[in-house]
Regions:
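Conserved N-terminal alpha-helix of the aminotransferase class I/II PLP-enzyme fold
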Residues: 65-98
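PLP-dependent class I/II
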Residues: 2-6, 10, 20, 26-34, ...
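Phosphate/diphosphate ligand-binding glycine-rich loop within oxidoreductases
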Residues: 36, 55-68
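Extracytoplasmic catalytic/substrate-binding loops of multi-pass membrane glycan-assembly enzymes
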Residues: 13-15
Length: 399
């Protein structure tokens, strides 16, 4: 049987990077002692008040169709929070609910881009951005971000990548996988380029609430940007609700209308009981997020302190989020070999970061998704594996 060219455009190295994670999940299901640090699904349970509201709504019969773009009370709550953090007034008409941020990015790409367009994206970039852009028929143009700069954007390189075919700039701040938070000066420069070249900006801000040392700034807060920015966010990371699939897109009301028509054909609305639970998540947001941020900060510090002592590894201290980039190029293996050999030898799954772009070659991504004791054990296993490589290397060289 024949399939459309779309399925080919969705294939690629970036989406195949999950193979080691799937192998780790299968090993864990068989009862093997594995530590899975290869994906951003934390070990926290969703806060009880949120769960109880979902159960209450289910028992109350909230199991019918809902408004395609989302119920007004939840959209209004999201709009109020966005207004508070950006200083730019938006309302429920500027918000559409999505089945997680991933769904929002995909929908935005389809509504903004078409064949012949180019989308400029700093690299390393999140794994699925390329497939989302290619699904629209557009071409993703990566802008390499040098590890020597701590993976901070070179705005001159971004400007050089813009052509008459450029339609949009996509980026994440804080960034997955690097944990970099874009400073205001870089965002001001991107905003200036977007206004100058009449470009859309899609800003993935899923980790905005989980910043450590550097304050998060939304590009939608800058002058002249609200009307050309699509802000994507979710409750997945900030509230330990990855499996609930609650995300949203914020943008001009006209765009929300287009997204709604796409959602009519694609999603047909989030379940009502989930939306009711999400409202409770917003009511308790301040405390939940503060607690979550502190846990991730402690976990980050545990991993950084332990792995920074391991000869052959170089850790980059993340400014936000739940991941750390670790340079393993000093170990004598490429990242595919390193991750798979580590997994088979020590039962720890990390993600080969080269899947996020060539600029991440030599790095692996480690997630702070288990408790501190388990993270410490994972670090010990990684250290033992690296030490074993260094013991074997002289023997191999002598042979």
């Amino acid at each position: 049987m024949k399939y459309s060219s779309l399925v080919e455009r969705l294939q690629g190295k970036r989406t195949s990077a999950w193979e080691i994670h799937h192998a780790a999940q299968q090993a864990r299901a068989r009862g093997e002692d594995v530590i899975v640090l290869s994906v951003g699904d934390p070990d926290f349970a969703t806060p009880e008040a949120i769960v109880e509201r979902a159960v209450e709504a289910l028992r109350g019969g909230d199991t019918h169709y809902t408004a395609v773009v989302g119920r007004e009370p939840l959209r209004a709550a999201i709009a109020r929070e966005h207004t508070r953090t950006t200083g730019r007034a938006v309302g429920a008409d500027n918000v559409m609910l999505c089945a997680g941020a991933q769904n929002g990015i995909f929908a935005a790409a389809l509504c903004l881009c078409e064949p012949g367009d180019e989308v400029v994206v700093p690299e390393p970039l999140y794994l699925t951005y390329e497939a989302c852009v290619r699904a629209s028929g557009a071409t993703l143009v990566p802008v390499p971000v040098d590890a020597a700069r701590g993976f901070h954007l070179d705005c001159d390189a971004l400007e050089a990548a813009i052509t008459p075919r450029t339609k949009a700039i996509f980026f994440a701040t804080p960034c997955n996988p690097t944990g970099v938070v874009m400073p205001r000066a870089d965002l001001e420069r991107i905003a200036q380029l977007a206004r100058q070249h009449d470009l859309w900006v899609v800003s993935d801000e899923v980790y905005a609430d989980l910043t450590f040392e550097r304050e998060h700034v939304s590009i939608a807060s800058l002058e002249g940007m609200a009307e050309r920015t699509v802000t994507i966010a979710s409750l997945s990371k900030s509230h330990a609700m990855a499996g609930w699939r609650v995300g949203w897109a914020i943008g001009p009301a006209e765009l929300i209308g287009h997204l709604g028509r796409l959602a009519l054909c694609m999603l047909y609305g989030l379940p009502g009981f989930i939306q009711e639970a999400a409202l409770v998540a917003f009511e308790h947001k301040a405390q939940i997020v503060a607690d979550m941020r502190e846990v991730y900060r402690r976990r980050r510090d545990v991993v950084y302190e332990r792995l920074s002592r391991v000869k052959g590894l170089r850790c980059l201290l993340p400014e936000a989020g739940m991941f750390m980039m670790v340079d393993v190029s000093g170990c004598g293996l490429d990242t595919v070999e390193f991750t798979w050999q580590l997994f088979r030898a020590q039962g720890v799954s990390l993600l080969d970061a080269s899947a996020f772009g060539e600029t991440a070659n030599g790095f692996v991504r480690l997630g702070f998704v288990v408790d501190e004791a388990r993270l410490a054990e994972a670090c010990d296993r990684i250290a033992a594996f690296v030490a074993g490589l260094q013991v074997r290397a002289p023997v191999l060289n002598a042979g």
